[in-house]
Amino acid sequence: MQNNEILKPAKYFSELEKSVLLALVEKYKYVLECKKSDARTIALKQRTWQALAHEYNSQPSVSLRDFKQLKKCWENIKARTKKIMAHERREKGKLFGPESNSHQALKEKVASMIPEQLYFVQNQPDDERGYNHDTSNQEMDCKRVSLLDLEVLIDEQGKIQTKPFRKVPETNSLCDDGSPPQSIDKAFPNGDLELLIDEQGKIQAEPIRKVPVTDSQCAQGSPSSSIKTESFVVPERDVYEDQNSIVNMHSSESSLHSTPLFPSSKISANRTYGRKPSQNGIFTKMHEEQHHQQMSILQLQLIQMNEVHVAKVQQIERECEMAEEEHRIKMEILNKKKMYWERKLQTITKEWPVASFNRPFPNSP
């Protein structure tokens, strides 16, 4: 290198150049983001990066770059996006603060290209006890809580106890024989109750005003027989109000001679929370990405096989041309030999005429 030659630093990628690079990477992402590490896949990735660099340099208003620079820039953008999104997840989990708007468009585009590397399954609520839960209803809707069936037991003293039990179909209608369902067995002596189930699973009972509820009667049941039953409503809500699930139970009035069938009443309720959007969509998208990736690899393999076939055909054509050339040269040599022997034969014929061979020898009798 000469002494007067000065090394110039590489130019930084502008926003336009980054946009062009992201568009090209999104075009070939099924090959570039493939997780395989065998020699064939690595060679395929390198050829794809070279093709991407050729397309990139053919775009207007961009600086000339080789495929190594473009690959390094894409890796830096991907690592920076992962770091930013991880930081936002931590901040959102701790403080539920607003998201940062810096590089929002670039971050969303990169996140849409590599969702399986950025999204993850949320932690269970038990792992978030140290975080601040005093948030709005919208934040509470994003919390993943598995559905839990509870069995509420109300004894004679009015005490309430809960325990999990098997899920049974809930109904407020009477059975065919006129008996009430097994989940409702006892009348409340103090009127209607309102059960409040909070996030920690604590249950509180408060008296509420009576709401008329119509129970379905069986066709075989006699109109004179009256049974004291309780009807309850478990609202299947997507949005919780003040972190409580309200269970309204109504006790209808009946005749005075009715007696409780069992010493305790069993009330089944479902703890329904606002859940975070399901991950099934993400898993489906990941399967689609894998399917498109496999289809792209198969397409590239077909292209390679076609190129090999064309190369073999060209090789056979060249061999045919070489064989024809060799045959032509051999024919020329044979023709030259033929002409040589014809000329030699003519010379011999001129020197030794045929009539001289018919004369007798001088000493012949």
UniProtKB/Swiss-Prot annotation:
Q: Which cysteines are joined by disulfide bonds?
A: none
Where are the coiled-coil regions?
301-337
Q: Which Pfam families match?
A: Myb_DNA-bind_5
Keywords (alphabetical) are:
Coiled coil
Q: Where is the Myb-like domain?
A: 13-78
Q: Which family does it belong to?
A: Belongs to the MSANTD3 family.
Per its record, how is this protein called by name?
Myb/SANT-like DNA-binding domain-containing protein 3
What species is this protein from?
Xenopus tropicalis (Western clawed frog)
